[in-house]
Amino acid sequence: ILSFVFACLLALSAVSAAPEPRWKVFKKIEKMGRNIRDGIVKAGPAIEVLGSAKALGK
């Protein structure tokens, strides 16, 4: 499920917005998607550490 969401965010961020003012909403959505994608990328190592710690605890 996460990989599907990540692929959608990549596709959303790859769309280039036109310089017209009515595309401002799409630029905001693109920026939000970029922030979410960056957050997922930064959280990856922490999730791996938690998973390995949980495995060691068993």
Curated annotation (Swiss-Prot):
Keyword Signal: yes
Keywords per UniProt: Antibiotic, Antimicrobial, Immunity, Innate immunity, Secreted, Signal
Induction field: Induced as part of the humoral response to a bacterial invasion. Transcripts appear within the immunized fat body.
Signal peptide range: 1-21
Major localization listed first in the record, in broad terms: secreted
Any one of the GO CC terms: extracellular region
Disulfide bridges in this chain: none
Localization per record: Secreted
GO BP annotations, alphabetical order: antibacterial humoral response; defense response to Gram-positive bacterium; innate immune response
Classification via InterPro entries: Cecropin
Function description: Cecropins have lytic and antibacterial activity against several Gram-positive and Gram-negative bacteria.
Family: Belongs to the cecropin family.
Protein name, UniProt field: Cecropin-B
Native organism: Spodoptera litura (Asian cotton leafworm)
